[in-house]
Amino acid sequence: MIPDNINNTTKITYHYPKLSVYGASLQGRALDGVVSFEAGHYDSRQDRSGTDYTIPNSQTKFLIGYQKQLREDFTIGLQYYNEYMHDYSEYKKNQPSELPKDKKLYQLSTLRLTQLLFHQTLRLSFFAFYSPSDRDYLLNPEIKYNFSDHVWAAIGGLIFGGGEKWSQFGQLDKNDNVYAQIRYEF
């Protein structure tokens, strides 16, 4: 997005700068579970020096994950995600002071706990996101029941908090909610 005036914006022009993406992923058994790794490089071709604040700087990103069945029908999953911004000093120098600044190193970790009960028809799950860099979080507890092979229902909640008014989950701090769903699949 390109604003016509950073202090008194009346018009925004949407702009999609050229971007090249390179990446790789690996997954396999290790540590009595499944380990996965993904990495990617976002090459910001139109502003490799990082001086144009309207074009995101190049970034290197990676994700490492681990999943293990701790006992019958109970699994744990962990993930750690990282974004590293290149040319951060140029980004800070050229970003207008009125705008919040991204971090040079953004981190996000997740935890998923899943318990299956009653011949795997009832699923209790808890999914948590936490950003050590932004200090914000999202918690998602859920109960799901399969009435048949075609009909299931779930109830859960989304709890947001921490961080700043502009961080990924902090901006949703007042948007906690409870949801219910019934689904028929054919």
What are these regions (language model features)?
Residues 32-36, 73-76, 119-124, 150-155:
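Repeated loop/turn-to-beta-strand initiation elements of outer-membrane beta-barrel proteins
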Residues 24-28, 37, 64-68, 78, ...:
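Residues on the lipid-exposed face of transmembrane beta-strands in outer-membrane beta-barrel proteins
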Residues 172-186:
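Outer-membrane beta-barrel "beta-signal"
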Residues 30-32, 41-45, 80-86, 115-119, ...:
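Transmembrane beta-strands of outer-membrane beta-barrel pores
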Residues 1-2, 47-54, 88-95, 126-128, ...:
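Outer-membrane beta-barrel translocator domains and adjoining extracellular loop/strand segments
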Residues 60-134:
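C-terminal structural cap/anchor segments
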Residues 1-74, 80-84, 89:
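Signature for the C-terminal beta-barrel architecture of outer-membrane proteins
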